[in-house]
Amino acid sequence: DSNCDCQKTLLANIKTNMLLLFHSKINFFMSEQQKNYYLKNVSKLKNKNNIVISSAFCDKDMSTIKSQKIDNKNDTWLIQKSNSWVKGTKNSIKYATEKKLNFKLFENLTREQMLSLFASSKGFIFLPNGFDTCPRTIIEAKLLGCEIICNDYVQHSQEKWFLNKTSIWDKIQNNKVEFWNIIKDHEK
């Protein structure tokens, strides 16, 4: 919501997050950068079990992605329209305009519609104003053959698993199994 009292909300979220992190048996993070940020800034977490698990995809979503035809790409760059300042829609529009890229804004699509749009488009521009630990849209766009333009706020963008489609598939297929194995190990 663009009208949120962000400072008050952020402070409340930080306090809640710290309570959860301090009292948990395991802390799951969405990216290495996110984990490292917390370890650097919250020394009490260094002795905790901190694990990067990333985004999770259900079998239906993975099947839908695999079923998309990606051999007929147009020259359109996609930008997700959002009223949330952190998503950086204005940054993405400015970038596309300055680079004279053919772009299209999208919003309020079903997952299937969005995946189909990614499958037929050249690329996806996402330039958030703040940390976005592991945005699914970036992962889905890359799996569907889109070129990606993003900034350092997309925290997983430089991680090894995100460098190519094969390693992305391997990562998301293993995430669910890895997560439940970790939970089972800690229940003992």
Can you annotate each of these PLM segments?
Residues S55-E112:
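Conserved catalytic-core segment of nucleotide-activated headgroup transferases in glycan assembly
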Residues R111-S121, L143:
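Short acidic alpha-helix that forms the nucleotide-activated donor recognition element
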Residues K25-K66:
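Donor nucleotide-sugar binding/catalytic pocket of nucleotide-sugar-dependent glycosyltransferases
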Residues N3-L10, N102-L105, I125-L127:
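Short, flexible loop segments at the rims of nucleotide/cofactor-binding pockets, characterized by
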Residues S2-N27, A119:
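Membrane-proximal helix-turn-helix segments that form the acceptor-binding/catalytic region
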Residues H23-I26, N74, S120-K122, G145:
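Short, well-ordered alpha-helix to beta-strand connector turns
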Residues L19, Y95, L117, E140:
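Hydrophobic/aromatic ligand-binding patch that stacks against planar heteroaromatic rings
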Residues L127-K188:
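Catalytic binding pocket for nucleotide-activated donors in carbohydrate/polymer assembly enzymes
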